[in-house]
């Protein structure tokens, strides 16, 4: 069981059955498509046509996919996955978080806006939404973060940051991390195959990156290894780290020391050469 939803609202631009089999097969009577275009003279949807917008979507009920949990409840989770789409190519595809890091990244709620997600967006823009859902959180985000850390410890839950965004460079230079690799990482975690592997620490974000994951190219696991120019990677990583710091300033007064230590390791006085 991954999460509980009443259905799904998914992007369908460039959709193929090979890339997204569950979503593709869920598009049948009862599903609602938005902003899509039919192939001329047919009732067949052209998922590669973005003439109206890149933001083509489908809504479908939960029973349009297999492997659902009915009714929607379960015991404590063993793993929590924070999903982010880092369009700057900086964050690792998967990293294990300490309770402090989990709280920090939960409060930050980082992702990136890319072309096609909103009108006027042509370059990647960092986007932060506290607790990954700021409009729906009436209390200070630190309250929810402390609750998360407490429950993590009580239930022995592991928290992972999974980046489904870019590798080898930012949007427009690098490439999107393949879905099959993300699925391989999730499967490895659920099967306990990342419990005993060696980890290394990201020099700027302090994240714990596995050195090995079955089904995933080793060089992909450390994002710096996928960039042709290491200095360019470090520069972009420091830039993103500063965006995290600037965003977190408004929460710092109510965040514990443990949470504050869960953020990027660098500050504004660190030089580029220290990390190359």
Language-model regions, residue ranges each:
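N-terminal leader/transition segments
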Residues: 192-196, 200, 257-258, 262-269
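Generic structural signal for alpha-helix starts
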Residues: 178, 217, 254-259, 267
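Solvent-exposed, non-transmembrane amphipathic alpha-helical segments
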Residues: 101, 205, 253, 257-260, ...
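Terminal-proximal interaction/regulatory segments of ATP-powered molecular machines
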Residues: 174-176, 195, 267-276
């Amino acid at each position: 069981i991954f999460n509980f939803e009443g259905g799904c609202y998914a992007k369908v631009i460039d959709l193929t059955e090979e890339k997204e089999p569950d979503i593709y097969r869920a598009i049948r009577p009862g599903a609602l498509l938005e902003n899509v275009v039919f192939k001329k003279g047919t009732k067949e949807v052209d998922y590669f046509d973005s003439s109206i917008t890149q933001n083509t979507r489908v809504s479908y009920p939960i029973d349009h996919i297999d492997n659902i949990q009915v009714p929607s409840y379960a015991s404590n989770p063993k793993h929590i996955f924070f999903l982010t789409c880092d369009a700057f190519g900086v964050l690792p595809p998967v990293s294990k978080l300490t309770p402090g890091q989990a709280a920090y990244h939960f409060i930050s709620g980082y992702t990136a806006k890319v072309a096609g997600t909103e009108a006027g967006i042509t370059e990647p823009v960092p986007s932060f939404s506290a607790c990954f859902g700021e409009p729906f959180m009436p209390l200070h985000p630190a309250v929810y973060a402390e609750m998360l850390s407490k429950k993590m410890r009580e239930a022995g839950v592991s928290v992972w940051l999974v980046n489904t965004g870019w590798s080898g460079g930012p949007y427009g230079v690098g490439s999107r991390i393949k879905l099959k690799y993300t699925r391989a990482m999730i499967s490895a975690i659920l099967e306990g195959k990342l419990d005993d592997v060696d980890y290394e620490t990201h020099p700027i974000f302090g994240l714990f990156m596995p050195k090995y994951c079955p089904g995933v190219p080793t060089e992909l696991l450390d994002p710096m290894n996928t960039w042709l120019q290491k200095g360019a990677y470090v520069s972009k990583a420091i830039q993103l780290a500063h965006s995290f710091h600037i965003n977190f300033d408004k929460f710092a007064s109510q965040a514990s020391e443990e949470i504050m230590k869960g953020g990027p390791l660098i500050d504004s006085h660190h030089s580029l050469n220290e990390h190359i």
